């Protein structure tokens, strides 16, 4: 019997991904800010110059857009029960300037007070907070979630006519 060489394994051959491929892999999952995308590329071993060039290229080609990212964050967080102060702070951590943040918050089509009331209804039931300790708890919850004072007062007042 002849000794035969083993057949080559049938498996995928993984080629090292280029910085652009890695960045696109991140962007197809969800939107990223320029700062966040650059940080993630650096964490994956991409050289700083190559990472910055990749982010610039993808921004120029429309794959990455801070305005689109900010609008998505506003939509997502507002739908999860967070207020404008929390969202503004979160967008600031992503390296967006105050003008971009203000523009993104302006795209929100809902009413912050109504969002606050919805959150209170989910936590305290349809009748809302009934006594002073519950109203304080509700106000504390809304403050932690980033709602402003006017929205907190309006949401914890809970007049049935509103």
Swiss-Prot record:
The keyword Glycoprotein does not apply. Keywords: Cytoplasm. One of its GO terms (biological process) is regulation of DNA repair. It comes from the Bacteria. InterPro entries: RecX_HTH_1st (IPR053926), RecX_HTH_2nd (IPR053924), RecX_HTH_3rd (IPR053925), Regulatory_RecX (IPR003783), WH-like_DNA-bd_sf (IPR036388). Signal peptide: none annotated. One of its GO terms (cellular component) is cytoplasm. Pfam families: RecX_HTH1, RecX_HTH2, RecX_HTH3. It is found in: Cytoplasm. The keyword Cytoplasm applies. Its main location: cytoplasm. Belongs to the RecX family. PANTHER family: REGULATORY PROTEIN RECX FAMILY PROTEIN. Modulates RecA activity. This is Regulatory protein RecX. It comes from Xanthomonas euvesicatoria pv. vesicatoria (strain 85-10) (Xanthomonas campestris pv. vesicatoria). The lineage of its organism: Bacteria, Pseudomonadati, Pseudomonadota, Gammaproteobacteria, Lysobacterales.
